[in-house]
Amino acid sequence: IGGALGASPSAGLAQDAGVHSKEDVGKAFPAKPPYSPYAGRRYPERPYFGDEHVHTAWSVDAGGTGTTLGPEEATRFARGEELMATSGQPVKLGQPLDWVAITDHSDMMGMITEIKGGNPEMMADPTLKRWRDMFNGGPVEAKKAVMELVAAQSNRKLPPAATDPKFAKSVWAKNTTIAEKYNEPGRFSAFIGYEWTA
């Protein structure tokens, strides 16, 4: 029996010990579909959640109808901070946003808070003073003031104090400063923005 088996166990394997080509290996191990369907993808795959259209007390429509929170408060709210709403109640998002764009109206941005607050330079104009009284006279009067103001703006009949370029520049500087203050690359994006009033 030993003679029948005669050769050492490694003798049969020695014949297969030669060098194999890539083709031989390819036949022995055929190509498989990619293990990871994501390999080689070059497009973004993580959604970022934010708000691209936020009006604050600086816009005529929001500020004129009761909103008291400005761009800084709106940005802090988007970042997940708790604050007091216009209604006097505490508010906080269930999950912070990844980004926000505060987009108050371009025309008269920030002017409404100055009118409502009785800015002395603006109160020298009788129309702006009357609007201030209407804004502070309750929701019905405030809505009428907003409609008058929008009509005057649409017809290019706003008082000169309401279109002062120096004031507009100062408001825009505040707006950009707020966005830059809260922008944290990699954590939260605060975009500098506005809505073009047409």
Predicted regions and their residues:
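Sec-dependent N-terminal signal peptides
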Residues: 1-2
